[in-house]
Amino acid sequence: MEEIQRYLQLERSQQHDFLYPLIFQEYIYAFAHDRDFGRSILSENLGYDSKSSLLVVKRLISRMYQQNRFILSLDDSNQNPFWTCNNNFYSQTVSEGFAFIVEIPFSLRFKSCLEEKKIVNSQNLRSIHSIFPFLEDNFAHLNYILDILIPHPVHVEILVQNLRHWLKDASSLHLLRFLLNEYWNWNSLITPKKASSSFSKKNQRLFLLLYNSHVCEYEYFFVFIRNQSSHLRSTSSGVFLERIYFYEKIERLVNIFIKVKDLQANLWLVKEPCMHYVRYQRKSILASKGTSVLMNKWKCYLVTFWQWHFSLWFHPRRIYINQLSNHSLEFLGYLSSVRMNPSVVRSQILENSFLINNAIKKLETLVPIFLLIASLAKAKFCNVLGHPISKPVWADLSDSNIIDRFGRISKNLSHYYSGSSKKKSLYRVKYILRLSCARTLARKHKSTVRAFLKRLGSELLEEFLMTEEDILSLTFPKPSSALRGVYRSRIWYLDIIWINDLANYK
């Protein structure tokens, strides 16, 4: 317990009080609608709604609190569309400014953390592709992974409590609680109903803030427990823990696991020095060099942790234990797996010669062709079998605009999947887009694809057909023999900060 107390003292976050008055400042809504903070608010037109003034916001909050939400439930609001429209307008207007205000403590804390650790705030640190070189270096030596789907739904009060550990402004928390309960009943959970779906779409900024704070709360506890269970302490993550009832919850968690109060004795059961954790969106991966028995212990530990700390039912089937050698992991739009790469070396000593068989583990990243074709079919570029079709919606555009749109999609996919181990599937996707482009142009000119290409020539598709290898050849006009191998190898870029829409399978 003394070590935990010292840990809390080192990681004590700053208290940020008096955020609630910022809701009534007009420039907050200007920033909420225009994220270019480098421009002067006095000399530039920020393009926000001029109705978001001090007086208007005060009236909106007053009207929101005057509504009797216990009488007008969600079912009653369906019978009164006028009340629903006005109430949604009040909540959405205030929530936009509120989400921006609550982000202030998080951004300040992140900035101070970078300054303390002397880390340069570079865009390259945010690149999605930067995680794959890490997987190449570490996952090839591991045996098992826990494929975890972060559980939800979460009760709205738990979301408010998570923010309470970061914010000390009670008025702001009361307003957040009121906004959330405008869409969900107090005794219900956040479920994918029409109300919650409407809330998440209209208030994406606030919804993402709440979800990220919920995931951060889980990860802060998890990293702390992970550090306690290993001799190799993690130094790359800044960890903040809940201050309220921390010792009591840790004691309950430990008692459930083995019925004793010694934290180290319990964590000894899951001690594993070689373990890696990766998360993106609602999916996380816990990879280890241990055995399946050890991974089952971690699975039980995580299920117990979620149920007791978040008062949330975490079904064990949301965690899958897979062996890396015979399982493909779907992550960030790629299918990743560890395969044995055999190599034969012929050695000769004097008159004797013999062959040496070596098998090296290698991480392969493949294009999930079937999932990608399903995304293309959903976007009306091909049918479900992968046969290209025309895009009639774009047939009214100019030829150059049509080619530019198809070419941009092809380049973006080629750019995102440049790290694929095998390019054959990527070439098939580019073929579908190329033929779909040709059929769209032929449909516009009321001609066949063959006649259209013969009449206008294939030079119209030169930009569309440019590959990553062509871009490299333009960068290095006369490549050496060593660079020729680079063209055929995997290329990871540090400028990709979000997943491609077609690769984001849902």
Swiss-Prot record:
Regarding protein family, the annotation reads: Belongs to the intron maturase 2 family. MatK subfamily.
PANTHER family found in the cross-reference section:
MATURASE K
UniProt protein name:
Maturase K
| Cellular component terms per the entry's GO annotation | chloroplast
Q: Which UniProt keywords apply?
A: Chloroplast, mRNA processing, Plastid, RNA-binding, tRNA processing
Per its record, what are the GO molecular function terms?
RNA binding
Q: Which domain of life is it from?
A: Eukaryota
